């Protein structure tokens, strides 16, 4: 059985991954450009879309994705 902290971290990883993809879609940003923005490969973005890969807290791509989502939110306000 997963520990509550581990479950919360997994949920946070899923939320940031989904929010990043949604923001990119709404801003009409291609997978190639998103990959450059968050510092992953285009194949990784494809795996993110298929829910086969989640951004992990504490990694550089996760932090860049958080900034990207914040940027989207400020533009959308």
Where does each model-flagged region fall?
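Non-transmembrane "mature" sequence context
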Residues: 1-77
């Amino acid at each position: 059985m997963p520990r509550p902290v581990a479950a919360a971290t997994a949920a946070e990883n899923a939320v940031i991954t989904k929010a990043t993809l949604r923001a990119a879609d709404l801003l009409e940003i291609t997978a190639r450009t998103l990959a450059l923005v968050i510092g992953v490969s285009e194949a990784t973005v494809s795996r993110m879309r298929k829910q086969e890969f989640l951004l992990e807290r504490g990694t550089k791509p996760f932090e860049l994705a958080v900034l990207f989502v914040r940027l989207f939110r400020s533009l959308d306000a």
